[in-house]
Amino acid sequence: MSVKATVALVGRPNVGKSALFNRIVGQRISIVDDTPGVTRDRIDGKGEWSGHSFNLIDTGGIFDEEDDILKQVVIQAEVAIDEADVIVFVTDGRDGITPADEEVAATLRKTKKPVLVAVNKSEGNYDQYAMEFYQLGFEQVISISALHGTNTGQLLDEIVELLPEQEYEELNYHEDDIMLSVIGRPNVGKSSLINKILNKERLIVSNMPGTTRDAIDTVIEREDQKYVFIDTAGLRKKSKIDERLEKYSVIRSIKGMERSNIALLLIDVTKGILEQDKKIAGLAEEKGKGLIILLNKWDAIEKDGKAGDKYYETVRLELPSVNYAPIMFLSAQTGKNVEKIFPVIDKVSKEHSKRITTADVNRVIEDAVNYTPPPSKKGKRLKIYYATQVRTRPPTFVLFVNNPELMKNSYKRYLQNQLRRAFGFEGTPIRILERVKQRR
């Protein structure tokens, strides 16, 4: 497996970062509005240009409207320096250079990473707008219109020219090694959990360069199985950005999950399920990762005989999209139940890689359809001719049907539940895709 390079968009609110993000990613997955500081849920996407692909993050998406603008731009620049291979500093040509732009520039000048200045909203006067922004001290300045697409091709040419010559290759990992990311909000105990695992598992532990960058993975060998904890160095170092900006944890979680098969989502049980917990859980599902939910700081909870059941039900209620994920109660601080993580990891890894025979898949789908036929849509009814599994990690099934548009989400969930009932799939999302059955 290889890791794509990362490009970060930086800039004050309302300079057009969202419009440029959408232009590069090629689909409208973020809100574009003229109100300064409009926030978005989606902050990552995939960019492709001239045969190169890269991860794209919009650092502006990690802020709320009420955040101070100067605080925003400085932290954006720090996030970009921390996470990106190439930084695109987006400005507004019509406004000229503002104090916030100067703050960003001052921070970015401290890095050795390549910085491109994209002077947006330069319609009608591209050369003149670009000249002013050379004052910020960067060599490459390009005037663009993200809205109309003018010169965005030139910008992308420059971006791919600056990307690392090769994708970061993972070293010495075997397909059977279990790749794990520890994800969650700041201060939920991620570094404590890693340290406790390493202290408890007095086994073969080695630190490996996870990529040709400076990420360090920790490899544990246990009963002939290798477990690779991704970027443990990054987890152990306290990020000043994390401390000041909780939403930065979403970017960190995205990056950790890119290389993992299974994500361990750590939640502080004393705080309950917060919005960032929900976002990070949703990312794990969206990216098709196996998932284990770890309720940390269980030692700090006053317990009666029903405490475990109560918290279990709360998690299921608050995180319905990942109701397949096993839930564990533990204390990273005291080590309680930490040693029980590995058998659950083994189980989820097996389920994530599970393959079902075509005959068994069709038997379950046929029984499900006979028991509850597909609902009609505009007077037409979905017909499912046959099904087969086409991928693992996550398990993915294709249904050959008369018309994919007749598949309702509610019926797809019903079929997913029937597959789970028959085959398990604990801890892993499953995908169902529809294809038109070709006539002979």
Swiss-Prot record:
Where the record annotates domain KH-like, the positions are 354-438
Q: Where does GTP 2 bind?
A: 184-191, 231-235, 296-299
| GO molecular function annotations of the record | GTP binding; ribosome binding
Q: Which GO terms describe its biological process?
A: ribosome biogenesis
Residues in domain EngA-type G? 5-167, 178-353
Sorted keywords for this record are: GTP-binding, Nucleotide-binding, Repeat, Ribosome biogenesis
The record's annotation in SUPFAM superfamilies points to: P-loop containing nucleoside triphosphate hydrolases (SSF52540)
Residue positions annotated to bind GTP 1 are 11-18, 58-62, 120-123
Stated family: Belongs to the TRAFAC class TrmE-Era-EngA-EngB-Septin-like GTPase superfamily. EngA (Der) GTPase family.
Assembly and interaction partners:
Associates with the 50S ribosomal subunit.
Q: What does this protein do?
A: GTPase that plays an essential role in the late steps of ribosome biogenesis.
**Name assigned to this protein:** GTPase Der
Instruction: State the species of origin.
Output: Natranaerobius thermophilus (strain ATCC BAA-1301 / DSM 18059 / JW/NM-WN-LF)
